[in-house]
């Protein structure tokens, strides 16, 4: 399986994402610059955290116009796994690949610490390695992680089981309905504010994020014929 880590000007979690895939998961991965126009050779697309284009205007608002986003949309339309973490989630929202928007944290402060999440849906290509209702520890690092959507969108997210992760015990940023991560209706595009790539080794405090990447590989192997 081959992963693409998209790199925008201002990305700063691309190395962590690369490490998670190459060193912890043992899969093939490449950095892909934001001006790339074709992602056909990749099986999964990863949009890392950071401050793309300095987060000017709004987080992710400029990155959505990058050349590579047309290819990301194409990959999503084809059903390939697309994961956006933190700033990557914000970019997916701005690009219309996921519903809703991000606001500043209620505290108006940047928050960087581990948080508890509850797995709300373990029947997705990103969460099959988790148990339903499992509580996991994943770090956050953001100033604009306060997810918001209108009532109709929230109702649809709940009915379709598109809310994949919720903050557990404490909501660190004021996010609506404690939402920490959502998928699109097809279930192949996941956006989440917590950083699973920073939780792939117990030496760093948690390895709970590794299961997310393992789930992606498991899904891909179950849906593709692997030849030697």
Swiss-Prot record:
Xref: Pfam families: GATase_5
UniProt pathway annotation: Purine metabolism; IMP biosynthesis via de novo pathway; 5-amino-1-(5-phospho-D-ribosyl)imidazole from N(2)-formyl-N(1)-(5-phospho-D-ribosyl)glycinamide: step 1/2
Keywords, in A-Z order: ATP-binding, Cytoplasm, Glutamine amidotransferase, Hydrolase, Ligase, Nucleotide-binding, Purine biosynthesis
SUPFAM superfamilies membership: Class I glutamine amidotransferase-like
GO molecular function, one term: phosphoribosylformylglycinamidine synthase activity
Record GO cellular component, one term: cytoplasm
Signal peptide: none
Catalyzed reaction equations: N(2)-formyl-N(1)-(5-phospho-beta-D-ribosyl)glycinamide + L-glutamine + ATP + H2O = 2-formamido-N(1)-(5-O-phospho-beta-D-ribosyl)acetamidine + L-glutamate + ADP + phosphate + H(+); L-glutamine + H2O = L-glutamate + NH4(+)
GO biological process, one term: 'de novo' IMP biosynthetic process
EC id: 6.3.5.3, 3.5.1.2
Function, in words: Part of the phosphoribosylformylglycinamidine synthase complex involved in the purines biosynthetic pathway. Catalyzes the ATP-dependent conversion of formylglycinamide ribonucleotide (FGAR) and glutamine to yield formylglycinamidine ribonucleotide (FGAM) and glutamate. The FGAM synthase complex is composed of three subunits. PurQ produces an ammonia molecule by converting glutamine to glutamate. PurL transfers the ammonia molecule to FGAR to form FGAM in an ATP-dependent manner.
Assembly: Part of the FGAM synthase complex composed of 1 PurL, 1 PurQ and 2 PurS subunits.
PANTHER family membership: PHOSPHORIBOSYLFORMYLGLYCINAMIDINE SYNTHASE SUBUNIT PURQ
This protein's name: Phosphoribosylformylglycinamidine synthase subunit PurQ
Organism: Geobacillus sp. (strain WCH70)
């Amino acid at each position: 399986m081959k992963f693409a880590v998209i790199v925008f000007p201002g990305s700063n979690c691309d190395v962590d994402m690369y490490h998670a895939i190459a060193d912890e998961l043992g899969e093939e991965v490449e950095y892909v610059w934001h001006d790339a126009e074709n992602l056909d050779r990749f099986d999964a697309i990863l949009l890392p955290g950071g401050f793309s284009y300095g987060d000017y205007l709004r987080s992710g608002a400029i990155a959505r116009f990058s050349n590579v986003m047309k290819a990301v949309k194409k990959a999503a339309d084809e059903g390939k796994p697309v994961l956006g973490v933190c700033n990557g989630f914000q970019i997916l929202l701005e690009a219309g690949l996921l519903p809703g928007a991000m606001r500043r944290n209620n505290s108006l402060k940047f928050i960087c610490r581990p948080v508890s999440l509850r797995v709300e849906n373990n029947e997705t290509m990103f969460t099959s390695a988790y148990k339903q209702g499992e509580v996991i520890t994943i770090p956050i690092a953001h100033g604009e992680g306060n997810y918001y959507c209108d009532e109709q969108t929230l109702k649809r997210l709940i009915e379709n089981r598109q809310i994949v992760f919720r903050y557990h015990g404490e909501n660190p940023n004021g996010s609506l309905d404690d939402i920490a991560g959502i998928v699109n209706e097809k279930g192949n595009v996941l956006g989440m504010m917590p950083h699973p790539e920073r939780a792939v080794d117990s030496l760093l405090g948690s390895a709970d994020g590794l299961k997310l990447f393992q789930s992606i590989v498991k899904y891909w192997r179950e849906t593709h014929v692997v030849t030697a």
